[in-house]
A protein has these predicted regions:
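Active-site core of metal-dependent hydrolases
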Residues: 2-124
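His/Asp/Glu-enriched, well-ordered alpha-helical/loop segment
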Residues: 74-89, 93, 105-207
Length: 211
């Protein structure tokens, strides 16, 4: 019903592969041309493999809302070795420490898709906000749930993620552009943007050393 009502508007859905019916759903959605991401999951290595084999091709904000290390192996260990997966990363230094992010980028940089996971306070000021019915406090640009202090989205913007990739993870400008633009377009199957070529959309931003 969602696919029919969406009429092509649904481009990606995140699914926890260990849930009942998840593998069948991944197969169905993939066959319908919808990108499926693995995320918000308590699964393990085997669950991630099953989801990927069923058609999942993206990992939602890697290292966040994911299972910890388990005897059976973690999802993170699968993600790092399976080249079929594009890997989202929130590069704000809070969701993933910059030193850890640097190691991830060095290991799988050509598969990294930078995302913001931004909430209403992005580009705004510290204070109290809501995400749905959840009360959130933003302090020093870090958004946390008032109920338990857990991270609640981010205030990161993509231009800052770009700068962080260069300054904190040591990547080249070309690599940062790929992680912010080319890789996301490739992951979503978008053909008309993501690189500078004849026939592509001319969505260009200018940066310099003071940006």
């Amino acid at each position: 019903e969602l696919i029919e009502v969406g009429a092509g508007a649904i481009s990606m859905i995140t699914i926890a592969p260990e849930l009942p019916g998840a593998i069948e759903a991944i197969k169905y959605l993939s066959a319908a041309g919808i990108k499926v991401a693995i995320g918000h999951t308590d699964g393990n290595f085997t669950d991630a493999a099953a989801g990927t084999n069923a058609g999942a091709s993206i990992v939602t904000h890697f290292m966040n809302a994911m299972s910890k290390e388990k005897i059976e192996g973690s999802i993170s260990s699968f993600v790092l070795v399976d080249e079929r997966l594009s890997v989202e990363l929130i590069l704000d230094g809070h969701h993933v420490p910059f030193n850890t992010a640097s190691e991830i980028v060095q290991a799988i940089g050509d598969r990294i898709v930078l995302v913001t996971d931004a909430m209403a306070a992005a580009g705004s000021v510290d204070g109290n906000y809501t995400i749905g019915k959840l009360a959130v406090t933003v302090q020093n640009s870090v958004a946390r749930l008032q109920s338990n202090g857990a991270l609640a989205g981010s205030t990161l913007t993509m231009d800052k993620a770009f700068v962080n990739a260069i300054n904190e993870c040591g990547v080249s400008i070309e690599q940062a552009v790929s992680m912010c633009s080319t890789n996301p377009a490739k992951a979503l199957g978008v053909k008309d943007r993501g690189s500078i070529e004849v026939g592509m959309r001319a969505d260009l931003l200018s940066y310099n050393s003071t940006s």
